[in-house]
Amino acid sequence: DALPISVYCGNQVVNTALDVEKMKTKSPGIALAMKAQYPPVDKTYPVPRDLGKAIIKRAVEDEFDVTASMEQPTNAKGLIGIGHAFGFICRRILRDRPVPILPILLNTYFPPNQPTAKRCYAFGQSIGRAIAAWGGEHADKRVAICASGGISHFVVDEDFDTRVLEAFKSKNVQPILDEPETMFRSGTSETKTWITVAGLLSET
């Protein structure tokens, strides 16, 4: 299912172990990428459910229809992993340390129900307001935000990338929000995760 916006609110989330046999069937580049996202053994991360619920509550108040996901999906082999967008962060940034994480999922890729760039920015603002309110009640906690994904790909568009980076640098994202949605196709759609974070940071 391709849900436009989802917030994971289960008790924990698992980055499942590398499937070595599956990796052997892949091209060298894909095999290398798999090592960068899957740990040698399953790694479990606690989820700050109260923060997730606060983000959902605020999003509903801001007129977003948000899915609350409570369990990781399974198949005949067992638990399905959290995907490379999160697995890469867990491996390369968190270094498999059991830091609490709250996965927020955007369907930037699969038609026909991808949120627009403007909608992603507004959702980011909603997340920012939710975190600010939650932080007021949890002064001993710190929240770090991490987007995942590239800018233009699989065809590289240097002009587009420059416009995006300059918009973030100048804190004037309106030109990017005004880009036609046809610019946010295929892998380039992942730019919307960074646009969401830009919206969040506008509330800090």
State where each predicted segment sits.
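His/Asp/Glu-rich, glycine-adjacent segments
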Residues: V7-P111
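Secondary-structure boundary elements
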Residues: K57-V66, L94-P100, Q125-R142, S170, ...
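Metal-dependent phosphoesterases centered on the DNase I-like endonuclease/exonuclease/phosphatase
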Residues: V155-T182
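Short, small-residue-biased leader/transition segments that mark boundaries at the very start
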Residues: A2-L3
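Catalytic-loop motifs flanking and including active-site residues across diverse enzymes
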Residues: L51, F123, F160, S189-T193
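Polyanion-binding loop/helix "lid" in catalytic or ligand-binding cores
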Residues: P46, Q174-T204
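Active-site beta-strand/loop microenvironment that shapes enzyme catalytic pockets
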Residues: Q114-V164
